[in-house]
Amino acid sequence: MVSVTRRSLLLGVGTSAAAAAALALGGCSLGQAPTRIRMACGEQGGTYVQFGELLRDALTRAGTTGLEVVTTGGSVANLELLKHRDAELAIVLADAAATDAQNKVAIGRVYQNYLQCFVRRGGPIGGLEDFPGRRISIGAPQSGAALTARRVLTALGLLDGADAVEVSELYLDEAMTALETNAVDAIFWSGGLPLPAVQSLETEVELVDLTSALPALEVDHPGMYTLAAVPASTYGSAESVRAIGVSNYLLARPDLPDDVAEALVDVLIGDAAQLVPEGSLGVQYLTASNLIDTSPIALHPAAQRRYRQLYG
């Protein structure tokens, strides 16, 4: 058996070495379904890891496929791990996935992300009109949040010229500390509701409505973003806050074994209630009619067949 460290997997290994690593982790031989697969998720404290852990537990209960949850910077990093065979599954924002629809397939659309912009309550930012010149963390390096945030800031005219903001890319724990210590004035996060890490902050925060960017986003990225809302109860606001929504896809490599793809579909549908984090307020897509909507990424053929077998 080949021994492969997590560090070598995340730094990237050659195709042949990565293939050997996958076999070693799975404890299988060529042509057989792996008994263990890796899923590239996101940062600790975020929704991606929560979902990955719930999916892992559901697969364990089903006795089909073991799942290793791999923490990463987010969607863009996850695509790289999938591309280089350092993960068999990845959860990825639809806008990040659509930048290159090749060499990947979808198992399903699983839930909606909300692009959230947190500022200190009573701080220097009360709305978008206060953004010019401010220090803003747009998300972790190689995260989907950073990709979406850059698109939003571009649409709002806040990345260039006299109104440009000062952009940094901070990991979640760094961003939270920076917000509390006034090192940044706002932080972006893309995830489900609520963001668990916010609930442990000593500093009171509030959300900024970013939805005035939607018309320009629709022109540049048609059909990718939707108008959503963060309920008032989420972070203690007196009213709901409008937000920008974007779907999440559970992606795989095209050579993911058919029986693994089928097992994943069975769990996504049969264990849907157990795949929603406790206290989650966001929109879930864990029904057959919603799971199959993964455009422009094609469904894994075996997953598509399984959806048809179950629901026609």
Predicted regions and their residues:
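Extracytoplasmic
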Residues: P34, T64, A77, Q102, ...
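Pocket-flanking alpha-helical
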Residues: G52, E68-V105, D173-L179, L193-L201
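N-terminal export signals
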Residues: V2, S8-G27
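Bilobed "Venus flytrap"/periplasmic-binding protein-like clamshell domains
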Residues: P34-A62, N113-T181, D293, I297-A302
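Pocket-lining segment of extracytoplasmic ligand-binding domains
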Residues: A94-A97, D160-L251, D255-L256
